[in-house]
Amino acid sequence: ARWVSHVELQKRQLLRAKENHRLNGLAVDDRNFVREDLYKHLRRAAKRDVEVDGIILDPPPMVPKRGAHLPPGQDYSTLVPLCAPRLAVGGWLLCFFHRRERTREEYEAEVVGASPVPLELLWQGTSGLDFPDDPQAKLRIAAFTRTG
């Protein structure tokens, strides 16, 4: 990638991302760390017809400003229609599933079903040894690719 943007509403998390870049020997350019509501950022990207090679979605279990836990899921039904069209054909979407109310398969079906562009499951993963042994309690990760 020629550039990466990290969009985060919480200042503390954005500072943590910058520090992680430093710790990994990566250049830190403040223009790549955007403190903004992701929903607004994605809507603006759509207006500018921005196209990207990859997106990492790691939404919190509780969405700021809405003040309440969402129905089962992490608001992928709203986020995916905003971000999937921004992917170039062949681009990837990496999703982190934190909440336990649903299975991995249900989350993956939600992502594919919410997308206005064709997505296919590319890869699945889980968290490491520092998470519980129960597969449903682990952090579940899935990568999708835009096929058309």
Where are the predicted features?
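S-adenosyl-L-methionine
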Residues: 10-53
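Conserved SAM-binding motif I beta-strand of class I
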Residues: 3-8
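S-adenosylmethionine
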Residues: 37-113
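C-terminal catalytic and target-recognition region of SAM-dependent MTase-like enzymes
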Residues: 92-148
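Surface-exposed loop/turn and secondary-structure junction residues enriched for glycine/proline
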Residues: 29, 65, 132-134
